[in-house]
Amino acid sequence: MSFSLNFTLPANTTSSPVTGGKETDCGPSLGLAAGIPSLVATALLVALLFTLIHRRRSSIEAMEESDRPCEISEIDDSPKISENPRRSPTHEKNTMGAQEAHIYVKTAAGSEEPVHDRYRPTIEMERRRGLWWLVPRLSLE
């Protein structure tokens, strides 16, 4: 489905509007009015560009300032740094070995049963936590 308009003028008429005998020239004023939106859009783009450049420069300066090493006096003055020292790798616990250890306790009946570590979740609970996003959320309300 196509639609087209075809305008033809008779030979004795002109394309300028009839003004009742007065001739007015709207050429320059119309051209200026048509150019205002593009000038405003250009000004807004330039302002946005300058804003982005300024933000990027300020964030780069902030990163460079935070990357510089601390002076000893700054460490003493800052409670955040002095109270939270980095832990050395020797103090970290190896959690892989804890899964392999098995502790058995003799019950009163004489049978041996594995002891449940109440500070460590069971393997089934860890599996459930790892797959929480598969379970749909159902409400009973």
From Swiss-Prot:
Segments in the Cytoplasmic topological domain: 51-141
Main location class: membrane
Domain of life per record: Eukaryota
Topological relation to the membrane, as annotated: Single-pass type I membrane protein
GO annotations of cellular component type: cell-cell contact zone; Golgi apparatus; plasma membrane
Positions of region (Disordered): 61-98
Residues that carry a glycan: 6, 12, 14
Biased composition (Basic and acidic residues): 65-94
Region named Required for plasma membrane localization: 77-93
Keyword Nucleotide-binding carried by entry: no
Transmembrane segments: 30-50
Alphabetized InterPro entries for the sequence: Opalin
Keyword field: Cell membrane, Glycoprotein, Membrane, Transmembrane, Transmembrane helix
Regions of this protein lying in the Extracellular compartment: 1-29
GO biological process terms, semicolon-separated: regulation of oligodendrocyte differentiation
Location(s) in or outside the cell: Cell membrane
Role of this protein: Central nervous system-specific myelin protein that increase myelin genes expression during oligodendrocyte differentiation. Promotes oligodendrocyte terminal differentiation.
Protein name: Opalin
Upper classification of the organism: Eukaryota, Metazoa, Chordata, Craniata, Vertebrata
